[in-house]
Swiss-Prot record:
Protein name, UniProt field: Putative dipeptidase ARB_02715
MF terms (GO), sorted A to Z: metal ion binding; metallodipeptidase activity
Gene Ontology terms describing biological process: proteolysis
Pfam families linked: Peptidase_M19 (PF01244)
Record field: catalytic activity: an L-aminoacyl-L-amino acid + H2O = 2 an L-alpha-amino acid
Class of enzymatic activity (EC top level): hydrolase
Protein family: Belongs to the metallo-dependent hydrolases superfamily. Peptidase M19 family.
C-alpha cells in the first residue's frame, strides 16, 4: 500500500500546474511569455501625451499621428502589443515654470494646460478603443486585461500642474487623474523637489501645507506619487499618509547615487507602508557614474536591490518612455518589456515574483488606496478647504480699493 502511495505521488508530481511543467526552467523567454499572459504588465509612467502636445499640438484626428502604425518616439500601438503591455499610466505632464524659483502665487497656465493633456489622453484612448480601455479604478484595469485590451490610466506629474491648489487637485481627480507626483523639477506650496537639493539648496521636505494635501489625496483615493520629490519629502509623507504610496518612476539610490532614486531607509518604510517603487529606466538615473554603459542588466540590478531591501511585494516598473532620450541597451522602447522579464527570471526571480513585479503589486496598492478612501469618506471626513498662508484669493485682491455693487464693465463678463 505504501508503495502504491509513493507511485501515485510520483505521478501527481508530473501533472502540470498552470503549464508550469511544460516549459523548461531555462527557457526564460517562454517563461516570461507565460508571466505576461497571467498578469497585466502595468507601467507607471509614460510621457506620450506630452510628445503628442509637442508634435501635433494635441491634434489626433488629422492623420498626422500614426499611433496605430508607427511613431518616432518610444511608444505606439504595435510596440505596446509586442511588449505585451496590459496597462499604462499616461503622464499628463506640463513643465515647471522656466524659472523654478518664480513665486508660486503668480498665475500660470499650467492648470489649463494640464486639463488639455487629460483631454488628449482620454481622446486618444477613445479613438483607439479597440485596443485601449480608459480606467479610473483597479477593477476596470483587471477587466481590460481579461478582455485583451491595454488599460489606460492618468497621472499628473507635479503639484505645480494644479497651481498648488487642493480644490484644483479635486477637479483633476474628477476629470480622471488617479495619481499626482507631489513635485516635478520645482518646489511648490507642498514640498521640496529632488532637483532643488541637487542644485545645492537645503532639503526642507514637506511644508506646513503639505499634510493637508496628503489628507485630501487619501480621502479621494488618489495615489500619492513620490517620484521627483526630495528624500526628506519622501520621509515626511510616509510618516503621515494613511494609504500606501507609489514611486511611479524611480530606482534604487544605493545602486546609483542619483537624488531621483530612493534610499534604503525609505525603501524599508515603503515596505511597512505597503507601497510600491516602480523602477525607471533612465540611464543617468540607473547608472549615474557611466550612463552610456547602462543596459538591461543594470535595471535588473535595481529591481533585485529593491526586492531584497523592501521585498518582492513592493517593486514594479515605470520606464519613463517618451520622457527621456537616455535609455539602456536592450530597453530602447516599450516593445522590450518581455526581454526585461526574461532577464529578471534568468537572474533568479520566480514566476510568482515576476507577476508581482509586472503588475500585481501596483494593482494591490491601488485597490488598498481605494478601500482606505471609502473608509475615510464613510467616516464623514469633509473635503479639505485649506490654502497656503499668504495666498492671494483673486487677482482683484491686489487692487487698493474694494468696489461694492456691480463691477465696472472692464471687470465683468460682458
Amino acid at each position: 500500500m505504501a508503495a502504491l502511495f509513493v507511485s501515485l505521488l510520483a505521478l501527481t508530481s508530473l501533472v502540470p500546474v498552470q503549464g508550469a511543467a511544460t516549459v523548461p526552467q531555462t527557457d526564460y523567454a517562454k517563461r516570461a511569455e507565460r508571466v505576461l499572459r497571467s498578469a497585466p504588465l502595468i507601467d507607471g509612467h509614460n510621457d506620450l501625451p506630452y510628445a503628442i502636445r509637442r508634435s501635433t499640438n494635441d491634434q489626433i484626428y488629422d492623420g498626422k499621428l500614426p499611433f496605430e502604425t508607427s511613431l518616432k518616439g518610444h511608444t505606439d500601438l504595435p510596440r505596446m502589443r509586442k511588449g505585451r503591455m496590459g496597462g499604462q499610466f499616461w503622464s499628463v505632464f506640463i513643465a515647471c515654470p522656466s524659472d523654478p524659483n518664480a513665486p508660486i502665487n503668480t498665475p500660470k497656465f499650467a492648470t489649463r494646460d494640464t486639463l488639455e493633456q487629460i483631454d488628449v489622453a482620454r481622446r486618444l484612448v477613445d479613438k483607439y478603443s479597440k485596443d485601449l480601455m480608459y480606467c479610473d479604478n483597479p477593477g476596470c484595469a483587471k477587466r481590460a486585461f481579461r478582455e485583451g485590451k491595454i488599460g489606460s490610466f492618468i497621472g499628473i506629474e507635479g503639484g505645480h500642474q494644479v497651481g498648488s491648489s487642493i480644490a484644483a487637485l479635486r477637479q483633476a481627480f474628477y476629470a480622471g487623474a488617479r495619481y499626482m507626483t507631489l513635485t516635478h523639477n520645482c518646489d511648490n506650496a507642498w514640498a521640496t523637489a529632488a532637483s532643488t537639493v541637487r542644485a545645492g539648496k537645503p532639503d526642507l521636505g514637506m511644508t506646513d501645507f503639505g499634510p493637508a494635501l496628503i489628507k485630501e489625496m487619501n480621502r479621494l483615493g488618489m495615489l500619492v506619487d513620490l517620484s521627483h520629490v526630495s528624500h526628506q519629502t519622501m520621509r515626511d509623507v510616509l510618516k503621515i499618509t494613511k494609504a500606501p504610496v507609489i514611486f511611479s518612476h524611480s530606482s534604487a539610490y544605493e545602486v546609483s547615487k542619483h537624488l531621483r532614486n530612493v534610499p534604503d531607509d525609505v525603501l524599508k518604510t515603503v515596505a511597512k507602508n505597503n507601497g510600491v517603487v516602480m523602477v525607471t529606466f533612465v540611464s543617468s538615473f540607473v547608472k549615474v557614474d557611466d550612463p552610456d554603459s547602462a543596459d538591461v542588466n543594470t535595471v535588473v540590478k535595481h529591481i533585485f536591490h529593491i526586492a531584497e531591501v523592501a521585498g518582492w511585494d513592493h517593486v514594479g516598473l515605470g520606464g519613463d518612455y517618451d520622457g527621456t532620450t537616455e535609455l539602456p541597451k536592450g530597453l530602447e522602447d516599450v516593445s522590450k518589456y518581455p526581454y526585461l522579464i526574461e532577464k529578471v527570471l534568468e537572474a533568479g526571480a520566480t514566476e510568482e515574483q515576476a507577476r508581482k513585479l509586472v503588475g500585481e503589486n501596483v494593482l494591490r496598492v491601488w485597490t488598498e488606496v481605494e478601500q482606505i478612501a471609502k473608509k475615510i469618506q464613510r467616516s464623514g471626513v469633509l473635503p479639505v478647504e485649506e490654502v497656503w498662508k499668504g495666498r492671494n484669493g483673486t487677482a482683484l485682491s491686489e487692487r487698493s480699493t474694494f468696489i461694492e455693487g456691480p463691477a465696472p464693465l472692464e471687470y465683468g463678463c460682458d
